[in-house]
C-alpha cells in the first residue's frame, strides 16, 4: 500500500498535529508491514498560492512556455501524480483562524483538476478518486466541531474530498489545546489512545 503523509503545521517540533500524524503513520506501518510511505512537508516546502500565472502556465503550449511556466507545470503535475499514486493519505490539518492552513489549501488547488480527479457531466460533477482512504489529524486551540466556527475546517475537508470521490475519511482529533496544560495533555492522550486502540483495529 502506498501511503502519502502530509504535514501542514507551521509550528515545527512544537506542532501537535505533526506529532500525531507521525504516530498514525507508525501505527499504520505496524499493521501494514508492506506499506510504502512518501512524506511531504507543505509548510517547509510550500507550494505557491494558485494564481493567474498558474493558469497561464497550464494553458500555454509546451513549446511556448518560459522556464518559470514549465517549472510551475512540472511542480503541479508531480504533486498530482504523488496524490494519485497514494492509496492511503495521512494529513495533518491544524485549524488556523477557523480554517485549514493556506499551505494545505494550495495543495488541494493542485490536486483538484478537472478531467483528472473530477469531471463534469450532464448530471453534475463526478469524483474520479474513489477507493482512497484518508486519515485526518485535526487539531485546534478551541472546540469548534459542530459549531459555525468549525465549518471551514473539518466540514471543508469533507467537502473537498467528497467532490473528488473520496468519502472514506477518519478523523483523529486533539481539540481545546489552548485551554491550559491539563486540557491539552488530556486531548493529546485521548488522540494517542484512539490511534493505538481503535484506528486500525480489525
UniProtKB/Swiss-Prot annotation:
Residues that hold FMN according to the record: 9, 15-17, 95-98, 139-142
Enzyme Commission identifier(s): 1.6.5.-, 1.7.1.17
Annotated keywords: Flavoprotein, FMN, NAD, Oxidoreductase
Record Gene3D superfamilies: 3.40.50.360
Cofactor: FMN
Manner of cofactor binding, per the entry note: Binds 1 FMN per subunit.
Its job: Quinone reductase that provides resistance to thiol-specific stress caused by electrophilic quinones.
Name used for this protein in its record: FMN-dependent NADH:quinone oxidoreductase
Organism per entry: Pseudomonas savastanoi pv. phaseolicola (strain 1448A / Race 6) (Pseudomonas syringae pv. phaseolicola (strain 1448A / Race 6))
Gene that this polypeptide is encoded by: azoR
